[in-house]
């Protein structure tokens, strides 16, 4: 007998009996520890330590607890699986019941239709029988007619049986059509889901394209604003050009005045030279007592002064001759500019904005060069007049001549410096004009790319709309065909019934 303090376990479990799944030896280690579970330790004759026995019992108890826990978890898992299987079974059973109910309802509807059809046929038969009775009462003597009527009735019965067989066949065909329609509905539902996903992708793509279009429109607006600014700049340059032309006219008038003053100065210079020659002759007559050496020196001095004066006069004449062709050259572009202004609008409209801008820039540059030349000419003439005035004011002609030569050298150096500065400025202006032309070409290229992109997007959207419309038309054309096949069977049965009724009425 076991002691009361020892744990009690099922006999099947401790004996290593059948497992929950039916397998033998599910827990083989229990048989090995059976004696320890049952408390059947060693006898008093076996010399073992009591502490080791207690430790062994504790280990066995822990193993038993773990085993019970595992069994409980296994039982819980099996219970959950059983519940899920029960729920699945119930759902499957409900679905089958619903389908059975729907099939029964369809069968009942078909039975009601066929019963109504049979009632109609029975009514026709009764009417035929009444007609047959009338014919029998009216034509009792005509046996051949009765035989013929009986033959017709037998034929009608045969036709009715054939119609019933045909009705059963049509019912089977309708059932098959119903199955095919269900399959088509499922396929259409799948196709609708695919179309919805595709529509969402197309909407996202359309939104992206609209955002890009808005960005490009903003760029176009910026480009248009820049073009407007360029046109405003062109208008301002045109106004500046008109102002420069007015200034050029004023400079021409000043040049004419300066030339007139230079002519007067030359005339006064010649008068002064004649006066000096007269004074020299008087001084020679008065100073006859002076030695030959002093006379020779005075003659040499007078000859040098005459040569210097002639050279100065020649330089003034050369400057006038140089100024006159330059003024002619500056005046010669005027008619060309006027001709360009008076040019017909058709020729100017045929040019591109870049070419017009280039022409305007060339005109402005040419006018600026002309203005600088006129200013330099005016400055030289003013300096020349100032020198002439100083020469007139001075008593010593040698100092005046030396100062005039030094001023001339300074003027030449200044002219060289100004020409170098003018060439540098013209180079800078050319580089700026090239940069401006490059920017305008980039703007034109961007506008062309934008127009090409808009055309491509319109083509893509049109193709997508056409493909979607063709799909809708094909689906709409397929639906009426199915309806035609369904209604043709029903109309065939109705027409046969009408033929029988007409035949009985004739008889």
Curated annotation (Swiss-Prot):
Q: Which UniProt keywords apply?
A: Coiled coil
Composition-biased stretches, type Polar residues, lie in 324-337
Q: Which residues form a coiled coil?
A: 64-292, 354-459
Biased amino acid composition, Low complexity: 1-22
> What are the boundaries of the region Disordered?
1-27, 324-349
| GO MF annotation terms | small GTPase binding
Q: How does it assemble?
A: Interacts with RAB13.
**Family to which the UniProt record says this protein belongs:** Belongs to the BICDR family.
- Report the protein name in the record: BICD family-like cargo adapter 2
């Amino acid at each position: 007998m076991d002691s009361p303090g020892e744990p009690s376990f099922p006999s099947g479990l401790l004996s290593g009996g059948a497992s929950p799944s039916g397998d033998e030896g599910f827990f083989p280690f229990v048989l090995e520890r059976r004696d320890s579970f049952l408390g059947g330790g060693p006898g008093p004759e076996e010399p073992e330590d009591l502490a080791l026995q207690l430790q062994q019992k504790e280990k066995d108890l822990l193993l038993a607890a773990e085993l019970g826990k595992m069994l409980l978890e296994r039982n819980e898992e099996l219970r959950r699986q059983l519940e899920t299987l029960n729920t699945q079974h119930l759902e499957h059973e409900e679905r089958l019941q619903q389908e059975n109910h729907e099939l029964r309802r369809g069968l009942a509807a078909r039975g009601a239709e066929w019963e109504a059809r049979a009632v109609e046929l029975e009514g026709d038969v009764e009417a035929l029988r009444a007609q047959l009775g009338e014919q029998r009462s009216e034509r009792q003597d005509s046996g051949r007619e009765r035989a013929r009527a009986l033959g017709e009735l037998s034929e009608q019965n045969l036709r009715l049986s054939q119609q019933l067989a045909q009705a059963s066949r049509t019912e089977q065909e309708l059932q098959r059509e119903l199955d095919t329609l269900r399959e088509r509905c499922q396929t259409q539902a799948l196709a609708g889901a695919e179309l919805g996903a595709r529509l969402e992708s197309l909407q996202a793509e359309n939104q992206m394209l609209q955002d890009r279009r808005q960005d490009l429109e903003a760029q176009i607006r910026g480009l248009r604003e820049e073009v407007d600014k360029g046109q405003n700049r062109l208008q301002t340059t045109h106004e500046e050009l008109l102002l420069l032309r007015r200034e050029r006219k004023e400079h021409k008038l000043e040049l004419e005045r300066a030339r007139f003053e230079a002519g007067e100065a030359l005339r006064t210079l010649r008068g002064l030279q004649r006066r000096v020659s007269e004074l020299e002759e008087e001084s020679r007559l008065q100073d006859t007592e002076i030695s030959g050496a002093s006379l020779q020196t005075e003659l040499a001095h007078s000859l040098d002064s005459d040569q210097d004066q002639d050279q100065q006069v020649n330089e003034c004449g050369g400057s006038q001759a140089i100024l006159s062709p330059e003024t002619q050259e500056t005046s010669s572009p005027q008619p060309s500019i006027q001709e360009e202004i008076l040019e017909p609008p058709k020729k100017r409209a045929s040019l591109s904005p870049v070419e017009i801008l280039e022409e305007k820039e060339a005109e402005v540059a040419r006018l600026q060069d002309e203005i600088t030349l006129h200013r330099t000419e005016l400055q030289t003439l003013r300096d020349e007049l100032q020198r002439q005035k100083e020469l007139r004011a001075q008593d010593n002609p040698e100092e005046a001549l030396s100062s005039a030569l030094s001023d001339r050298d300074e003027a030449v150096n200044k002219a060289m410096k100004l020409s170098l500065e003018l060439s540098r400025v013209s180079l800078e202006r050319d580089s700026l004009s090239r940069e401006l032309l490059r920017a305008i070409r980039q703007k034109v290229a961007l506008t062309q790319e934008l127009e090409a992109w808009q055309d491509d997007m319109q083509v893509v959207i049109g193709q997508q709309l056409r493909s979607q419309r063709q799909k809708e038309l094909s689906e709409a054309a397929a639906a009426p065909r199915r309806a035609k096949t369904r209604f043709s069977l029903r109309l065939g049965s109705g027409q046969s019934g009408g033929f029988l009724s007409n035949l009985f009425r004739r008889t």
